[in-house]
Amino acid sequence: MSGGGGGGGSAPSRFADYFVICGLDTETGLEPDELSALCQYIQASKARDGASPFISSTTEGENFEQTPLRRTFKSKVLARYPENVDWNPFDQDAVGMLCMPKGLAFKTQADPREPQFHAFIITREDGSRTFGFALTFYEEVTSKQICSAMQTLYHMHNAEYDVLHAPLADGGDQSGMEDGEGIPGTKLQRFNSYDISRDTLYVSKCICLITPMSFMKACRSVLQQLHQAVTSPQPPPLPLESYIYNVLYEVPLPPPGRSLKFSGVYGPIICQRPSTNELPLFDFPVKEVFELLGVENVFQLFTCALLEFQILLYSQHYQRLMTVAETITALMFPFQWQHVYVPILPASLLHFLDAPVPYLMGLHSNGLDDRSKLELPQEANLCFVDVDNHFIELPEDLPQFPNKLEFVQEVSEILMAFGVPPEGNLHCSESASKLKRIRASELVSDKKNGNIAGSPLHSYELLKENETIARLQALVKRTGVSLEKLEVREDPSSNKDFKVQCDEEELRIYQLNIQIREVFANRFTQMFADYEVFVIQPSQDKESWLSNREQMQNFDKASFLSDQPEPYLPFLSRFLETQMFASFIDNKIMCHDDDDKDPVLRVFDSRVDKIRLLNVRTPTLRTSMYQKCTTVDEAEKAIELRLAKIDHTAVHPHLLDMKIGQGKYEPGFFPKLQSDVLCTGPASNKWTKRNAPAQWRRKDRQKQHTEHLRLDNDQREKYIQEARNMGSTIRQPKLSNLSPSVIAQTNWKFVEGLLKECRNKTKRMLVEKMGREAVELGHGEVNITGVEENTLIASLCDLLERIWSHGLQVKQGKSALWSHLLHYQENRQRKLTSGSLSTSGILLDSERRKSDASAVMSPLRVSLIQDMRHIQNIGEIKTDVGKARAWVRLSMEKKLLSRHLKQLLSDHELTKKLYKRYAFLRCDDEKEQFLYHLLSFNAVDYFCFTNVFTTILIPYHILIVPSKKLGGSMFTANPWICISGELGETQILQIPRNVLEMTFECQNLGKLTTVQIGHDNSGLYAKWLVEYVMVRNEITGHTYKFPCGRWLGKGMDDGSLERVLVGELLTSLPEVDERPCRTPPLQQSPSVIRRLVTISPNNKPKLNTGQIQESIGEAVNGIVKHFHKPEKERGSLTLLLCGECGLVSALEQAFQHGFKSPRLFKNVFIWDFLEKAQTYYETLEQNDVVPEENWHTRARNFCRFVTAVNNTPRNIGKDGKFQMLVCLGARDHLLHHWIALLADCPITAHMYEDVALIKDHTLVNSLIRVLQTLQEFNITLDTSLVKGIDI
C-alpha cells in the first residue's frame, strides 16, 4: 500500500477512505475562481498584473460589479488523511471542486453563517464511483494579510464602481443597480461592505469524508458531531484525531445484509446495508424529492431520465441537487444511468452544459436570477428542473409512462400515509424546517439539516415535557377522558417483538424510502417479466461478440413490442433504444449463471422468477391490467430486523500516541490535525484484536471478504465491458484544473463521440430496414411503419439537434437546427432577386393540353428552401423544435437529407458566424464523414413524413397517359378519377375534357393504393384506351404508377366504363444533380401490357399447372405473412389481392387453364362461365334438386354473391366483376367452397378441356387446402374494391 497505506485491510474493508479539509490557503492568498481559465480560453482575454502579493495576478475572472464579499475565490485541499490508498487513488482536483463547488465564500459578523452539508459523487471515466460528504462552515479569518487583501479589493471595487456609475449619479431612479435586485447600488454597497477596523471577516472551510459506499446519514452525523465539537464551548472528551482515526481505520464497512454501530464525538451512529437479494443501498430521503417537486413532476422527470434526455437540475442548495439526482437514478432499478452524471456541477465546469450528449447535471442557483435569465446552450432535448420553485420544463413529444395514472395513484397513497402531500409542498423545505430548527434548537447539532446529535429524543417526548401540553393533559384527565388510546406511538414497529435502535423519524425515512422504491421496482418487474424470452444469445464466443458488439442485435425488440399492450408502445419503443437498456441486456448476455451475474441483475431476475411462479398466466401473455406491489412488507421487515439487532459494534475512539501540546483546542476553529498519527493506520491493531470475539453474525469475516472481492471483480468486469462497447458517447467528464488544452481535448472527445454515435445510428437504422426488406416476398411493401420507425427517426432528430447545439455562439430559439435554417433562408432571400425562388409554376400551370402530353411528368423542383416553405406552411406545427423535426422527416422521405445539410453547411461564413471554432460543424473532416453517413439513408425508403403528418393538406399532381394508337386522341367523353390511399380517398374528381394533367389539393392520403378511372360514355367516340396513370405527391415527391393497358368503353374489351387500378411506388435515381429522374425504374415493375383475360388461343399465357399452383401459393403466402406482422408494420393488402402477383391474378390463371377456344371472333370471359354456373345452380334450387345441405348452402351463397356483383351500379366490366367476386370471397372465407362447387358443376365439363386444372380433382383439392389457410384472418377490403355493393 502506498502513501502510508491507510492501514491494514483491503478495498472493501473500511468504512471511509479519506478525511479531507478544504479551505483558504493563507500562503497563496486570494485567487479568483477557476472561471478565469475558461474566460482565457474562450474569450482570449488578456491577463492583468495584480497589485498585491495576496491578490492573484490573474484577475480576469473577477466581476467588479460584485462586491468582494459576493465573489468566489479559489479553495485548496489543505489536508487529507491518509495521503493515498491503493484501491481509491485520491483525486485532488475533483474533491476540491466538489467540496466547495463555487470556491471560497467570505462573510462578516452581520451575515448568516449556518453550516451546510452536501453529498457528492466522483464518477470516473470508466463509470466507477466514489462518494463524498462535505460539511461547510465558517471560521474567523486570523490572517492580517488576508484581511488587508480583502480591504484592498474593496478599495479597488469602490473606485471601479464610482467610475462606472458616475454618469448615472443624477439619474434619480436610474441610480446604479447591482445584481438585478432592484436595490440602489449605494445601499447595497453599505450592506455588503467590509471595514477592517470594525468588521470581523469569516471564510468558508469544509471537512469531508470520502467513502466507497454512500452511507449519507452516517457520514453526515460524523461530520456534524465533529463540527459541534469544534464550536462547543467545552472541548470534546478526546482529541479530534481520535475520532477521525477511528472512522478511518477502525470502523469496518458493513457487509451486505448487516448493520453497524460506531461512535461519534457525542453519540452512537448506526448504518445498515441491504443484503444481496434486496434493492441496492440508497440513503437519501425520497420524501424530500416528492415534497420539493410533487408526484406529477417527479414522474415526468423520471420518464425523461429513462429516455436519456439531457436533464439539468437547478437549485440554491447543493444537497437538494444531489438528493433529486440520486433519487431519480435509484428509482430506475434495475437500469442504470449510462451517461454524463454530475449532480453538482462546479462553477468552473459550466462549459460542460455545451456537451452534445445525454447528461444529468445539477447547476447551482444564486437565488437572484430567474429561469428567463439562464442562457442554456441547447434546449430542444432538455428537461429543466427548478427544484426550489416546484417547476419543470419538458422536451416536446414526451411519451407517457405505461399505466401512469394507476402508478401515480399507488405512489400517492404511500406518500399520504406518511403525511406527504402528493402535489408537493413549496413551503415545507423552508418555513417548516425553520420552525423545527427553532423549536428544537438546543438539541440540534446541525442547524441546517435538523439532525439531533447523541441519543435523540422523539417528538412526542418533547411534547410531554412541554408545560402547556402537560396542563392540557391534566385538564382532559379531570374530565374523565382516557388518553391511553390517544398516545402517540413511540415506535412504528411497537406491535412487533423487537425495537429498532434508531429514532422514529429515521425509521420512517427508511420505511418511506423502501416502500416507494419497491413500488417503482415492481413496475419494471411487471413490464419486463418475460424479457429473457426475447434476449438473442450470441452464437460466437465472448471475445468475438465483444469485438462486434456494436453490429449485433441482442434483443428482439419487434417481437417484444408486438406482445405489449397498445398504450405501452410509445414509451417502450423509445426506451428499448436507450443505452441503459442496451447495457442491461449486455449484462444479461455476459452473465451465464448466478455466480457471474451483476448484483443488480441477480436481484431483478429473482423478482422476475417470483412473479412467474405466482402468476397463473404464461409469461409471454402480457396484460395491461395494473398489478400493485406486494413486496413492501417483506422489504420493510428486513430493514427493521437489521436496525433492531445490530450485527457489529465498532471499536470506540481512544487516545492515540500523539505529541503533547499539539492540536490545542480553540472554540470556533478546526484545529490543525497531527498528520503523523492520521496518515498511517494501525500496524498491529490491538484495538481490533481486543474486539476479536465480536464477529459478524451468521458469517465469518473471511467469507464476507471473499464475497466483497467477488462483487468488486464483477463490477470491474462490467465497467470494462461497457467501456469497450458503449464508447459512442463520453461516459464522464474528468473534473480537473482547467487549461486550454484540457478544454480542447474535452471538446475533441465530444466531436468524436458525436461522429461515432451518428455512425452507429445510421448503421442501426439501415440494418433494421434492410433486414426486413430481405425477408419480404411478393410485394413492394418493405418499410418499417408505426412505432419502431418513429422511434428511430426521433432518435436521429435528437442527435441532429445535439450536433447543431454544440459550440453555438449565441442560442437563438429552442431548436439550433431550425435557427440555422432560418438564417440560411434569410441570407438566400437577401442575395437572390425577388421571384427567382418562386415554384408556383408547378401548381398554377396545372393543366396541359392533350396535344402537349408526354409519357412523363414535368420535373419537381428540388430545393432546401422549398422544403422549408412546405414546413412553414403547415399550421399544425407550432414550435421550432417541431418544425426542425418535420423538415428532417421530409428530407429523409425525399432522400435529400444529406444533400440539404451539405448545402446548408456550404455557407461557411454563416457557419463561422453562428459557431465557435471547436464546434462539430466546424470540424471539416468529421463533418464530411457525418454527411457521408447520412447519405446511406438514400438506399432505403422512408415514409416518416407521410405517416406522421396525417391531417395536413397536400397537393397531388395527376398525369393520364392514353394510347396514341387506335384513335385515342378522338376521345369525346367526360372522364373522372378517384384516388385512394392508406389514410383515405378523394371524392370523384371531374377531369376537364382534353386535359390529361392536373393538380388538386386534399388531406394527406398516405401511401397511395388504387386509382378508379372512368368516363360518362358521352359523345360520338366514347372509347378510351388508357396505358397508365401517374400520381405524384408534390411535397414528398413520391410518384405512383397505376398500369392499365385496357379499354374503357361499351363494346370494347370487356365493356367496362371504369376500372380500379392498383399502383406501386416508383423509385428515384441516386442523386447526381438536381434534375429528377424522367424515366424512373419501377420498384416492382408491373407490366404496362395488361394481362390478357380474353380467352384466345393466340394470346393467352402459356402457364402449366405447376406454375399456376406456385403463383397461387405465393399469393396466399404473402397474405398470411401480412397478418403475421405487427399491425403497425403491415403493408397494403390491396396490392396482395389485386396487384400483379396478387391472389386475383393467380386465380385468373387457374380459371384460364384449359378453357375451350371461342368460336370465330367472340370473346369469352371467366365471368361468362361464372354466370352460367350461377344459372345452373339457381335452376337446381328451383327444381328442389338438392344433393346435401352443405352443398345447398354453398350454392346459395355463390349465387347470391354473383347476383349482387352483377347488380352493382358501377360499370366495371366482366374482369372487374371477377376481381370484386374474388375479393368478397376472400373477405368472407368462401373461396375454397366456391372452387369445390365449380369443380363439380356440369358447366365446367362443357367449357373446359379435359386437361384443365379445374377438372383435375387432385389439383383442385390441393388448391382448396391452400385457400383454407386464409380462414383464420380477418380480411378488410379497400372501399374502392367493393364500392357500390352491399353484401
Swiss-Prot record:
It comes from the Eukaryota. Its main location: Golgi. PROSITE patterns: DENN, PLAT, RUN. SMART domains: dDENN, DENN, RUN, uDENN. GO terms for cellular component: cytosol; Golgi apparatus; Golgi membrane; retromer complex; trans-Golgi network. Guanine nucleotide exchange factor (GEF) which may activate RAB6A and RAB39A and/or RAB39B. Promotes the exchange of GDP to GTP, converting inactive GDP-bound Rab proteins into their active GTP-bound form. Involved in the negative regulation of neurite outgrowth. The gene is Dennd5a. Belongs to the RAB6IP1 family. Interacts with RAB6A bound to GTP. Residues 416-598 form the dDENN domain. Residues 278-414 form the cDENN domain. This is DENN domain-containing protein 5A. Residues 954-1062 form the PLAT domain.
